């Protein structure tokens, strides 16, 4: 019997108590109330599910409508363990002082809002300028589940590292920002390119076409080819069809033992069975930059999805840097801090630049 429960957990509402009652005086913005699920894809395209936290309607006996609500004490405890990276920015700056910061950023839900149509997940010009500003002072990488070319088309910054397909397609900057070379540790002239899953391209392409055919009957579904992995989006699918979609995808993948299935935010991910993930990409990039084995590096990884947890765990195991989860609801995470949405990510990046330019004075004022 298919276990759908695990596939719904990331979209379920996990906090149902007023945050003000649990804050104890700390500065943490209130969580948004759950939004109603939109079943028509055209209607959904005009709305943004900012947190992926809408109520989850279910196929009876399969996908649960809500996760168990947390108590005020549980919410308070979660916030103690994962405070706002903005409210506690001075602590972040103190931990990074005297060390070389390296910035890793997820794309969807981190630099851009989560939208119904993944092809319209545009980042704002203000966010692009914030990322460009960070890249002038710190080595900066985009680590995304997207195809590397697609995420580059969204970001449009040549001075960054890009790790697409959940880190399975990596390439270095094609241009340098004014101060970027000063921070680069890779050998001059060396092109950083790495594709650990290249042998899987034929089978991934085959499965892509099979899934396109199988999903054709499910209105609102979208199969995205991310080169070294595939994504089946169901954000625009009627909730009554979620179980059907899940079953069809699983039936296809069962015939391909070299592939595995995982869950993102209203998306099913198909990836090669290979010991490589976003955490592996983070380690590879740090090594490429010459930081392997050094204790004066401070990696900062910001992401919103469960696939980013691999990177958060790597940082915890290293005992260096911090992971920041972008979320509006409490959830299990290895990240140390939180930000609520892309606008807060933008503000955090701007603050990083300020302390680089102004030192401790950058902590004062907006």
UniProtKB/Swiss-Prot annotation:
Superkingdom as given in the UniProt entry: Eukaryota
Pathway: Glycan biosynthesis; trehalose biosynthesis
E.C. designation(s): 3.1.3.12
InterPro entries: HAD-like_sf, HAD-SF_hydro_IIB, HAD_sf, OTSB-like, Trehalose_PPase
An example molecular function term from Gene Ontology annotations: trehalose-phosphatase activity
Keyword annotations from UniProtKB, A to Z: Hydrolase, Stress response
A single GO BP: trehalose biosynthetic process
Record flagged with keyword Phosphoprotein: no
Matching NCBIfam families: HAD-SF-IIB, T6PP
Family the UniProt entry places it in: Belongs to the trehalose phosphatase family.
Name listed for the protein in its UniProt record: Probable trehalose-phosphate phosphatase 3
Species of provenance: Oryza sativa subsp. japonica
Taxonomic path: Eukaryota, Viridiplantae, Streptophyta, Embryophyta, Tracheophyta
